[in-house]
A protein has these predicted regions:
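Phosphate-binding loop of NTP-binding sites
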Residues: 104-257, 264-274, 278, 282-292
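N-terminal leader/targeting and accessory segments in enzymes
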Residues: 1-102, 106, 250-261, 276-292
């Protein structure tokens, strides 16, 4: 069940939507109809929603969406001529995942621009989930309120989020908007198939991307996350453990009496890639050690 509604920051008219993406609005007189949320399944439709089915749609589903208060729906051109009994405005289009991602992002207020977005991937799901938790703890130690998106434990600051996995692009934008509204400075994503559907990160700007396998090249890491719609752009930093992060982590692990510093090293490498000063990291580690 996916709907962008709890954290909608913007509204959009059907006319603007159709003109922006080159879609066909029927009737054209519905151009000023304003949608207030987006839903990709019938169960998620609320009054004012735009129904954007994630799978093949039929007239029966459109009728259900209409009954539940949808203000419009995006449907394929193949349905033209079969919807005479549908009274809500229809937008005929075959939108790409990129277009849908931009639409959902715009409706949610582009939350990834208000957050430092960290993402961790790898071939071992359990390790990825562990790295996400460790990074969340480390960012919290540095004084950053954090949101986490992970099938094992999603939360916005201290608020646990009851979600159905894997998450769609609509879900991800909604959760990130919730985190931003709650005051999070950063959000951490677990890039695994249990957490995310394909293309779930369309139009999400990832600032720092890391992999639990330090032997992969940047190109291999980018290929690994492409199925989730995670585009590695010029602003994306791909982080991995370095001699510097290993040394800082080893020093901290010794102080704590721990034997494994690999996970802490990756967390340190990621926050260094995000622009946090080494002096600040050392200070936080020292304070944490003294408190413990």
């Amino acid at each position: 069940m996916s709907a962008v509604s709890e954290s909608m920051n913007r509204r959009m008219t059907l006319g603007l939507l159709a003109s922006r993406y080159g879609f066909d609005l029927d009737p054209t007189s519905a151009a000023e109809v304003t949608i207030t949320s987006i839903a990709d399944d019938v169960e998620s439709v609320r009054p004012g929603a735009l129904f954007v089915p994630s799978a093949d749609v039929d007239v029966h589903q459109l009728s259900q969406a209409q009954e539940q208060g949808a203000y419009g729906a995006i449907v394929p051109h193949a349905l033209r001529g079969q919807t005479d009994d549908i009274q809500i405005p229809l937008i005929y289009a075959e939108p790409t995942m990129g277009q849908l991602g931009k639409l959902v992002r715009d409706m949610a207020g582009n939350p990834s621009d208000a957050l430092a977005v960290f993402a961790i991937t790898g071939k071992n799901r359990e390790i990825v989930e562990s790295e996400v938790r460790n990074l969340a703890d480390f960012l919290h130690m540095l004084g950053n309120p954090v949101g986490v998106i992970s099938s094992s434990d999603s939360q916005s600051l201290e608020r646990f989020l009851n979600l159905e996995y894997p998450l769609s692009a609509i879900d991800v934008q909604r959760i990130m908007a919730v985190c931003a509204e709650d005051g999070a400075a950063a959000v951490i994503l677990a890039l695994d198939e249990e957490t995310l559907r394909e293309d779930a990160l369309q139009s999400v700007s990832v600032d720092v991307l890391a992999c639990d396998d330090n032997g992969l090249s940047d190109a291999e890491v980018a290929k690994l996350v492409a199925k989730f719609g995670c585009a590695v752009g010029k602003q994306t930093r791909i982080a991995g453990r370095t001699q510097e992060s290993d040394l800082l982590a080893a020093q901290a692990a010794t102080a704590y009496g721990q034997t494994d510093s690999r996970s802490l090293s990756l967390s340190i490498a990621m926050v260094l890639a995000a622009g946090v000063r080494k002096a600040n990291i050392k200070s936080a580690l020292r304070v944490s050690r003294d408190l413990n």
